From Swiss-Prot:
Database matches in InterPro entries: FAD/NAD-bd_sf, GIDA_C_N, MnmG, MnmG-rel, MnmG-rel_CS, MnmG_C, MnmG_C_subdom, MnmG_C_subdom_sf
Protein name: tRNA uridine 5-carboxymethylaminomethyl modification enzyme MnmG
Family membership noted in the UniProt record: Belongs to the MnmG family.
Name of the gene encoding the protein in the UniProt record: mnmG
Single GO MF descriptor: flavin adenine dinucleotide binding
Cofactor(s) of this protein: FAD
Keywords: Cytoplasm, FAD, Flavoprotein, NAD, tRNA processing
Subcellular location: Cytoplasm
GO CC entries: cytoplasm
Length: 643
């Protein structure tokens, strides 16, 4: 009998994969004092941004703020490496404000690698993990991870393992009808790990995503295109001023598809992997290829395309909104149908990548797998898309792996408390069969779950868990004290109709002042903001912007916030609310069509079960709760009316 192989090394935690999920998981564990090893196929591609070199955007920026509030690093690095920043949806309410940063992808990766290399308790290893070492058995209910095995036969012991393999499991890239094994362009896929998971009883499936071509900016007539500069007032992802690094911004540019673009695509749809039938994996709904846009939105004669720089020391431009599966020989011709790109040089072709993933219904809310104790999964492996979603999952998986190792209870993030909670709740309860991205519409609590208050919601928890240090805690306390003081001032200081600035305020707001008015009530008037108070000499312009805006939001939306907080508490209480049998869900017109179908088929016993059905959104659950309460009131009224 051959003796068991001796382990090459032993760690408390092993993280497999060096993308955005893996980096957050490894850093979280190491900072909590756990002996951690991060394994990557290529240490020169740590935290690489293979698709859009950008961080943030709608709902994604809220995730980044939340990760930062919990001590994560994606926001700090985005602030340090930003080429430009813009606040999206700035004309709308604070619930949907979204900071987006175009980042220098090479600088981002370099800074992450340096951070990993200088973090105590963290080791980096370049190797392909192909197997999972376990003890016990599924039959006896004590199946547990004990380590990993690499391609060349080395065994590394660990008490817990976090898998963050991205698009590398069974990865295959496609350009037209040509394909090759790869996790992304120029990098080999991971072999063996999918089979190792399947051997342990896990179900796996395939997804796909894509990335557009890159062109040489020196070959593009940028001067003929609409310029999109950075916002004049710089905003930050991180709540830590030490992470704020200002640098000369770079502009993006905008072009549009033409009739020639659309015709070329229509004539060659059969040559793309999806429409040609070469692959049938589902791609991301909210990041469609240009051929998908033209097929799905046939009534539109043009689509907006953004030209975005990839870094300060590279001429490459990322062609956002123009991913394609067309053959390489047609891609340059397609690019040259765009205004400003008539003479462009294509440096890298667009491609699709198909990969294995682990449906996340096989996970607990801690992101530990249900089948194997000590085995966690995070990031694109769980069926998500986006660096931000990956970073959030990585932090949660790393944190809970530490707590498992130490015999502590896992930390669960409820969906009503954060977008992180919304993300994880959707992943582990809904049968998702396409790449998942976070959206503000996925949360019924978006007015409460804003980016600006992520620290208020999560930093006390981070302090309790040891994720942030005393300096960060002091920064948090100073900010909250400042907001409380300014809110109190706004609620008590009054502007009198006889005050010198009153006429200017009345002219701006278009509403008279009857005697006097508090500054808080002024802010509640449409179109009047804290900047206006400063302009009229009614607020201190030296007060930090985050303090002024935090106080403004608290007073301006106090009624809405109170109602949403009550709604959160009501839904929490009603999780076990029984649903009477025999309900005709089709008669409840406030439910979506899909929710009516799912509820009718499943006949859930309570609201908690209803909320976990695929296709039943949080808004549907709220609508069902309100309908049940209405039935209760009507029944009570009927009872009272009886003689």
């Amino acid at each position: 009998m051959e003796p068991a192989a001796l382990p090459t090394e032993s760690f408390e935690l092993i993280v497999v994969g060096g993308g955005h999920a893996g980096c957050e998981a490894a850093l979280t564990a190491a900072r909590l004092g756990i002996s951690t090893a991060l394994f990557s196929l290529n240490l020169d591609r740590i935290a690489w941004q293979p698709c859009n070199p950008a961080v943030g955007g709608p709902a994604k920026s809220q995730l980044v703020h939340e990760v930062d509030a919990l001590g994560g690093v994606i926001g700090r690095l985005a602030d340090a490496t930003a080429l430009q920043k813009r606040v999206l949806n700035a004309s709308r309410g604070p619930a949907v404000w979204a900071l987006r940063a175009q980042t220098d992808k090479r600088q981002y990766a370099r800074q992450m690698l340096q951070l990993l290399q200088h973090t105590p308790n963290l080791a980096l290893r370049e190797a392909m993990v192909t197997g999972l070492e376990t003890s016990g058995s599924a039959e006896s209910g004590d199946l547990r991870i004990t380590g990993v095995r690499t391609y060349f036969g080395s065994i590394y012991n660990a008490q817990a393992v976090v898998l963050t393999t991205g698009t590398f499991l069974g990865g295959r890239i496609w350009v037209g009808n040509q394909s090759m094994p790869a996790g992304r362009a120029g990098e080999q896929p991971a072999e063996g790990l999918t089979e190792a998971l399947q051997a342990l009883g896990f179900a796996t499936d395939r997804l796909k995503t894509g990335t557009p071509a890159r062109v040489d900016r020196r070959s593009v007539a940028l001067e003929t295109l609409e310029e999109q500069p950075s916002d004049a007032h710089e905003r930050w992802f991180s709540f830590d001023p030490e992470a704020w690094v200002s640098s000369e911004p770079m502009s993006c540019h905008i072009t549009r598809t033409t009739a020639a673009t659309h015709q070329l695509i229509k004539d060659n749809l059969h040559l793309t992997p999806i429409y040609g039938g070469f692959i049938d994996s589902k791609g991301p709904r909210y990041c469609p290829s240009i051929e998908d846009k033209i097929v799905r939105f046939a009534d539109k004669d043009s689509h907006q395309i953004f030209l975005e720089p990839e870094g300060r020391d590279t001429p490459e431009l990322y062609i956002q909104g123009f991913s394609t599966g067309l053959p390489e020989r047609l891609q340059l011709k397609l690019l040259r149908t765009l205004p400003g790109l008539e003479q462009c040089v294509m440096l890298r072709p667009a491609y699709n990548v198909e990969y294995d993933y682990l449906p996340a219904t096989q996970l607990l809310p801690s992101l530990q797998t249900k089948r194997v104790a000590g085995l966690f999964s995070a990031g694109q492996l769980n069926g998500t898309t986006g660096y931000e979603e990956a970073a959030a999952q990585g932090l949660v998986a790393g944190l809970n792996a530490v707590r498992l190792i130490r015999g502590q209870t896992p930390v669960h993030f409820p969906r009503e408390g954060s977008y992180i909670g919304t993300l994880i709740d959707d992943l582990v309860t809904k049968d998702l069969r396409e790449p998942y991205r976070v959206l503000t519409s996925r949360s019924e609590y978006r007015l409460v779950l804003r980016g600006d208050n992520a620290d208020r919601r999560l930093t006390p928890l981070a302090r309790e868990l040891g994720l942030i240090d005393a300096r960060r805690w002091q920064i948090y306390e100073r900010k909250q004290e400042g907001i409380a003081a300014e809110t109190k001032r706004l609620e008590t200081v009054r502007l009198k109709v006889s005050d010198p600035v009153a006429p200017a305020v009345v002219e701006q707001t278009g509403a008279a002042i009857k005697g006097s008015i508090t500054l808080a009530d002024l802010l509640r008037r449409p179109g009047f903001h804290s900047n206006d108070l400063v302009r009229h000499g009614l607020a201190d312009g030296e007060l930090p912007v985050d303090v002024r805006e935090g106080a403004e939001i608290d007073v301006k939306y106090s009624g809405y916030l109170a109602r949403q907080t009550q709604q959160i508490e009501r839904v929490q209480r009603q999780g076990q609310r029984l649903i009477p049998s025999g309900i005709d869900f089709y008669s409840i017109t406030t439910l979506s069509r899909e929710a009516r179908e799912r509820l009718t088929a499943a006949q859930p016993l309570n609201l908690g079960q209803a909320s976990r059905l695929p296709g039943v959104s949080p808004a549907d659950v709220t609508a069902l709760l309100l309908w049940l309460e209405l039935q209760d009131r009507q029944a009570a009224t009927t009872t009272l009316a009886r003689p």
